[in-house]
Regions:
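ATP-dependent adenylation/nucleotidyltransferase module used to activate substrates
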Residues: 1-148, 159, 167-170, 175, ...
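AMP-forming adenylation/ATP pyrophosphatase catalytic core
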Residues: 11, 36, 118-125, 132-350
């Protein structure tokens, strides 16, 4: 089969390409130019493009660079900035996967006559009736959460070659065949934000910051912040302590009112989170009222048993046990209660 491999310049996508070549597929590598600004934090750098090109050369496959900077700006960077301006906590990696890698790149693969699109994500896709997205074999590197917004159309045409491998196995295999990326560190940060500049410096170039009052649950003033747009629900850093000596946690952020409400650890829990239906994506079938599921609210978050209720135009995830607050804008991935490694769907917290 003809397979287009998204090669980021990292070890996972390098091994994905190598495995497909070994299996006898007609493989072509593609690296995405996504960001025209400065970045030193991985997956968008000139060095990454060169690593991908050199690996493709080593494997004897063609390699192309696709310029998707405008799409990336429109669908990832600008929504990220806008979300912070509204006091929300976005996940740009999920949006990049949904709108760029598994939309724009998949469309390009189709138009160029490829049968499949491959990436180096640590997750699995099975095709038993419906196409199912499942957790990767390595629980410490599982990336099913960041792919949880994919549906049947995308999963039908996607292959994830390293999903059955642990990260150690990936690196060992890369070293065995002499890939230059075998020892390359994983990228850790938002790819379009440089480590030196950081989130604050990046956002400060894009939006105005506003000071805000910090109050406790009774409305009593307990402090202030210089930039309400940088505060996240659940945050404790920089929030100080109460009169009882307990650390403060952010309970809510109101950007228009320039107000941050804090409480102690006992206050910083939630029993439910609302997911507007307009933000929901279902892998196969939607969950109905009372259906059971397992929720995950961050890439490395602890899975939490829950029930799903309907409330007008939203699904409401009701946790069996209290959880840390879910910040507005965070993605909540839902997994099958009978097959906990299988993604059912995902939505964005209101």
């Amino acid at each position: 089969m003809r397979v287009l491999v998204a090669m980021s310049g990292g070890v996972d996508s390098s091994v994905a390409a190598a495995l497909l070549v070994q299996q006898g597929h007609e493989v072509v590598g593609a690296t995405l130019k996504l960001w025209g600004g400065p970045s030193d934090s991985g997956c968008c750098s000139v060095a990454d493009v060169e690593d991908a090109r050199r690996v493709a050369q080593q494997l004897g496959i063609d390699h192309h660079v696709f310029n998707l900077t405008e799409d990336f700006e429109d669908h990832v960077v600008r929504p990220y900035v806008d979300a912070h301006a509204q006091g929300r906590t976005p996940n740009p990696c999920i949006e990049c996967n949904r709108a760029i890698k598994f939309d724009r790149l998949l469309d390009r693969a189709d138009r160029l006559g490829f049968d499949l699109l491959a990436t180096g994500h640590h997750a699995r896709v099975t095709h038993e009736g419906a196409h199912r997205l499942r957790r990767g074999a390595d629980p410490d590197k599982d990336q099913s959460y960041v792919l949880s917004m994919l549906g049947q159309d995308e999963l039908a045409r996607v292959v994830l070659p390293v999903g059955e491998m642990t990260k150690d196995e990936v690196r060992a295999w890369a070293a065995q065949i002499g890939l230059r990326t075998a020892g390359k560190p994983d990228s850790q940060d938002v790819c379009f934000i440089g480590r030196v500049e950081g989130r604050q410096g990046f956002l400060q170039r894009k939006i105005d910051f506003h000071p805000a009052r910090v109050v406790d649950r009774d409305g009593e003033a307990v402090g202030s912040v210089d930039a309400v747009e940088l505060v996240t629900v659940g945050q404790r850093r920089g929030m100080g302590h109460g009169a009882d000596g307990q650390r403060h946690y952010v309970l809510s952020v109101d950007v228009p009112a320039r107000l941050v409400t804090v409480g102690n650890a006992a206050d910083a829990v939630t029993s439910r989170v609302r997911l507007p239906n307009t933000t929901m994506t279902w892998v196969d079938r939607p969950l109905g009222p009372g259906d059971r599921a397992v929720a995950q609210v961050s890439a490395h978050g602890r899975p939490a048993a829950c029930s799903v209720a309907w409330n007008g135009d939203s699904r409401v995830v009701e946790f069996d046990e209290p959880q840390r607050p879910v910040a507005p804008g965070q993605t909540v991935a839902l997994y099958d209660v009978t097959e906990p490694d299988a993604v059912v769907g995902a939505g964005i917290a209101a």
